[in-house]
């Protein structure tokens, strides 16, 4: 072995070089130990410097969320099945709260509650991230709701109008068509530059697949993001899914775009949160829900807004869905969400079973801010429709107990029956504004009185085709003027009369 001689001047330069390369950074890792685990909950000892809502990393790779910060331990909920987490497992605090990637690349994709793709189409390439939980826009950041968001449903657009930036609750028993209204609204946004986010919470995978198929067939998936937390997902993911959907929509809202978010449904989220809270031994309140279940939904729905011009005029419209039991809207979660939202569309099982679909109960459905956003032409043509239908429903109930009605009442009943036919619509067939206006105008101006009740729907379908093919000036007039001008009235009067003669003659 050759011994190398180092000169004295080299020694000093080597020492200087080593000193320059010395890194004095000390990495402090916050580590604890699991002492109890089960039912998706882990209790951890030794995690002293942890934030509420901080992400925790377990030794086996499982991720958890710190929710209970107690004097001697931390209660965390697991985001996986947690089967490999056991007593003594090391846990590391990440120092970060839950955040997800966001961006244009999410359009047309199906993701889970952590925004990870689950549609088998590969990774989603994006550079930006957003916190899952972020503050709602303040008062100064907002503008009042003034632009319409058309659902394509006559019953909603005419009588319970929705504006961009509004929160409108869809409430009703199971199997009354709540999801159908939401998906029809997504279909109707085609070509209107509205980004849609559909959040499925605690639903069967087959139900979500059905929605995906409907949107794909109609070409609506291109402008839609689906966030799915299925019924077999851990309660933590069902709890987080709506906030993930809101964060994805917020990205577009703050870039000046218009978005629509559907939460289907918040009853399941509340149940998942109740499960987590009870397992964390938080004190139960009414219906065993924790005391902050109102805040659970209010902080989510307050994120929907119409932004001011200074912030780019973007908007986020929320359509939360809540399921009732036997039509009981006075239960805890329904009353909470009704008080947070700007109105509700109430779907009735009785109306649904009677054959009127969408099964909207016009009498107790309301839109508190939507009238300011309703198109002038719709306001003019449908102004008295809600009142007329409410009076008709009352008279119809009364007529069941009385056989001899005067002529005026019989006329009102006949008119009401025909007006009700206007509201009937097949699923996944939203109507444009000109088509809706023509249908309502024909009904409110007495043109349908010459028809039998069972002929009304066929007549209206034919009328829409007639206007489309033979009266192109009608479409131009409605789209350009947006008001029921004498010109639009003249076109409608002549077209409806002309088609009515043809229809009756055939």
UniProtKB/Swiss-Prot annotation:
One GO MF annotation is: proton-transporting ATP synthase activity, rotational mechanism
| EC number from the UniProt entry | 7.1.2.2
What are the subcellular locations of this protein? Plastid, Chloroplast thylakoid membrane
Q: Which Pfam families match?
A: ATP-synt_ab (PF00006), ATP-synt_ab_C (PF00306), ATP-synt_ab_N (PF02874)
| Keywords associated with the record | ATP synthesis, ATP-binding, CF(1), Chloroplast, Hydrogen ion transport, Ion transport, Membrane, Nucleotide-binding, Plastid, Thylakoid, Translocase, Transport
Question: What this chain does, per the record?
Answer: Produces ATP from ADP in the presence of a proton gradient across the membrane. The alpha chain is a regulatory subunit.
Classification via HAMAP family: ATP_synth_alpha_bact (MF_01346)
The record, for PANTHER family, names:
ATP SYNTHASE SUBUNIT ALPHA, MITOCHONDRIAL
Q: Quaternary form?
A: F-type ATPases have 2 components, CF(1) - the catalytic core - and CF(0) - the membrane proton channel. CF(1) has five subunits: alpha(3), beta(3), gamma(1), delta(1), epsilon(1). CF(0) has four main subunits: a, b, b' and c.
Q: State what protein this is by name.
A: ATP synthase subunit alpha, chloroplastic
């Amino acid at each position: 072995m050759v011994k190398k001689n180092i000169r004295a001047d080299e020694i000093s330069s080597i020492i200087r070089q080593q000193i320059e390369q010395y890194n004095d950074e000390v990495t402090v890792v916050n580590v604890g130990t699991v002492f109890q685990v089960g039912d998706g909950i882990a209790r951890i000892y030794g995690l002293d410097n942890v934030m509420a809502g901080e992400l925790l990393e377990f030794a086996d790779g499982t991720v958890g969320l710190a929710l209970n910060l107690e004097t001697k331990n931390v209660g965390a909920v697991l985001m996986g099945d947690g089967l490999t987490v056991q007593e003594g497992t090391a846990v590391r605090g990440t120092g970060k709260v839950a955040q997800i990637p966001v961006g244009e690349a999410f359009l047309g994709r199906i993701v889970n509650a952590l925004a990870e793709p689950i549609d088998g189409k590969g990774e989603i390439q994006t550079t930006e991230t957003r916190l899952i939980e972020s503050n709602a826009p303040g008062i100064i950041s907002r503008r009042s709701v003034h632009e319409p968001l058309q659902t394509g449903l006559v019953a909603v657009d005419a009588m319970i109008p929705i504006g961009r930036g509004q929160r409108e609750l869809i409430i009703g028993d199971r199997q009354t068509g709540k999801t159908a209204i939401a998906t029809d609204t997504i279909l109707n946004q085609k070509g209107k530059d509205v980004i849609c986010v559909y959040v499925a919470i605690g639903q069967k995978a087959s139900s979500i697949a059905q929605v995906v198929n409907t949107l794909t067939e109609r070409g609506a998936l291109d402008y839609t993001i689906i966030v799915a937390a299925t019924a077999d997902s851990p309660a933590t993911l069902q709890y987080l899914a709506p906030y993930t959907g809101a964060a994805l929509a917020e990205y577009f809202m703050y870039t000046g775009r218009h978005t629509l978010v559907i939460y289907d449904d918040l009853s399941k989220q509340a149940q998942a949160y109740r499960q987590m809270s009870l397992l964390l031994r938080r004190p139960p309140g009414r219906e065993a829900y924790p005391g902050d279940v109102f805040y659970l939904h209010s902080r989510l729905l307050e994120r929907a807004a119409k932004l001011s011009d200074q912030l780019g005029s973007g908007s986020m419209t929320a359509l939360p869905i809540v399921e009732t039991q036997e039509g009981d809207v006075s239960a805890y979660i329904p009353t909470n969400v009704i008080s947070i939202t700007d109105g509700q569309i109430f779907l009735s099982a009785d109306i649904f079973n009677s054959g009127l679909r969408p099964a909207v109960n016009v009498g107790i459905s309301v839109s508190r801010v939507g009238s300011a956003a309703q198109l002038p032409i719709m306001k003019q043509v449908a102004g008295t429709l809600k009142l007329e239908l409410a009076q008709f429903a009352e008279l119809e109930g009364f007529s069941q107990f009385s056989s001899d009605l005067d002529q005026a009442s019989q006329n009102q009943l006949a008119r009401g029956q025909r007006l009700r036919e206007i509201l009937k619509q097949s699923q996944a067939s939203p109507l444009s504004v000109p088509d809706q206006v023509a249908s309502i105008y024909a009904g409110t101006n007495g043109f349908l009185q010459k028809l039998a009740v069972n002929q009304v729907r066929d007549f209206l379908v034919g009328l829409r085709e007639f206007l489309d093919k033979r009266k192109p000036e009608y479409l131009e007039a409605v789209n350009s003027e947006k008001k029921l001008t004498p010109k639009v009235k003249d076109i409608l009067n002549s077209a409806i009369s002309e088609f009515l003669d043809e229809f009756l003659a055939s």
